[in-house]
Amino acid sequence: MRVSRRTGTPRRSRDSGDTVAAFFTVTENLLKTKPFQDITVAEIITRTPHSRSSFYHHFDGKVDVLVALATSVLDNAYRGPGLWDAQPGRSRARAMHASIGPTIAMWTDHGDVVGAVIEQMHTTPVVAQVWKETFDKFVTAVSAQLTQQWIHEEITFPASSATMATILVCGIERTFYVSSRGLDRRLPAPESAVEAIEWITLTAVQGRKPQNMAPAAAVFSPQPHLERAIDGTSTARAEQTDSTADSILDALRSLLLEAPLDKVSVAKITARAQVSRSTFYFYFDNKNAAFAALYRGLAEAAAAGLRRLHTIDRTNASLVETTLTEWLQIDDHAVAIMRSALHEWPRRAELRTVYREGMSAMADILESILIQDRTDGVALAGPPPDQFAAVLLWTVERSIAGALAGEDHLDDLGQVISSLSALLTSAIYGR
């Protein structure tokens, strides 16, 4: 089998199966121990009985191995009639539910491969195309179901059915990614997210409280980790800075308005901040550490914005939706930081820690609100509040990432924000 870089699809020969399978197995095993960008072709080859010439007979490089391996995983996961083959209506609704099973199996058995694809898709177009083909099939199928249901039930959302379908599929993608990678304590495994995913999907499809899902317990006891969210104290580590460190971060912030993080160097930062290289390294270990500090400030501001929900009358759904919309609004400087953060955090260790802290702080806040409002009878009984809060926020996070990347059906950031606000309000409080 030889992979075409232009199409990302393998050309098979009858006698190549065992050789290719060996390269696949070694690559998948390596992905369990290190990120894809740190794997070399030499590592792949030396862990098989095959030669370098044999490797290059089948592949142009390690990216081609990932493309072919991911293609195989996706083909096997969704082999046979799929969600997209069912007719819109009850048949497709059943197929939407049934598709969760093979999706969980794929992430459970091959999460390292699919995770590597997710991490590389914003920087490597041929990898992105592999994922996009399956992603788009789900979006098209869910969009058709939404269109039919909305017309029949006279339901409206701020966005088109294609945009809402994309938001739903984005949420599922990101939720399974973080749960399979162990990146969110609220979602220890893909199975833990299923109830929340189905609730959110049915909210979009039905536009009201999902009728065919058993409600969770109506009363929950706050956990110790939630008390910090309720009293308004930030859980993120405080940064000790002075005016020089602030100047460095301001310089980085302004450079991000001009270029993504990959294109910003320490030399450019020091020149813009008018400090020496040694001064930069006195405050920060490297560029990634400086960006992590910059993002921490943004994450703390985002948590403070979400905390405003504690101060409003949440029996007023319109006020809740307005507050959520205001929380999600992003100015130009924040867009520049978020665009790099959203796309880079899975691949950069320094940023990943800070990013998870920020997401966890917001989940604490939303979970505490869910518990309080369910206890007071304001919010709908639904999925467990810890898992529900996590899935809602990862859906927001991935959808905003897609909007900032200009992905299909998410190119209008304002519409995406309005849709997310409406979806969260409906999922938590009903229509």
Q: Where is each model-derived feature located?
A:
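Hydrophobic/aromatic residues within well-ordered alpha-helical segments
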Residues: 19, 23, 62, 69, ...
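Short, amphipathic alpha-helix enriched in basic
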Residues: 17-43, 47, 224, 229-268
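Helix-turn-helix
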Residues: 30-64, 68, 255-289, 293
